[in-house]
């Protein structure tokens, strides 16, 4: 009737209604590391939730629940893989699923005609210690130099002279 595009966030109790949720085709946003039930509505919290939802055919998007922890989102996706989620489904939870759910169909994947935003990683992007080697935004390489990297380079040179 109202043509709403619904998205559910949290859904720690999703295992209780997994069949109904899958049939509804409503995407969910979860924190894959939120496994401590700290309220009544989170009693079913589990590290396996990401895999359970994804394996049931539910579109999963990841968040960190707190903006100051956003740097942990890749680690959360990695934890989801460690607890049974398919690796490519976890990557999609950070990219393609997000773009599709929010109506950005020309983003989120490496496809001809899409915006050319891409990060090339030195190793597995779901490993917390991994850093991007290159980032391209709209097809243009971004400078990854930071104050920290300049300081590192400066002091490494001083150590090398000794």
Question: What are these language model-derived features?
Answer:
Residues 158-159:
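Charged, amphipathic alpha-helical linkers/stalks
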Residues 13-24:
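Active-site-adjacent beta->alpha loops and helix N-cap segments on the catalytic face
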Residues 5-13, 33, 37-39:
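Catalytic beta/alpha-barrel core
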Residues 20, 72-75, 131-132, 147:
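Short acidic, glycine/serine/threonine-rich loops at helix termini
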Residues 12-14, 66-67:
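Short glycine-enriched loops at secondary-structure junctions
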Residues 112-155:
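C-terminal cap of metal-dependent C-N hydrolases
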Residues 1-6, 17, 131, 137, ...:
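Polyanionic/metal-chelating signatures
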Residues 22, 27, 31-35, 39-121, ...:
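His/Asp/Glu-enriched, well-ordered alpha-helical/loop segment
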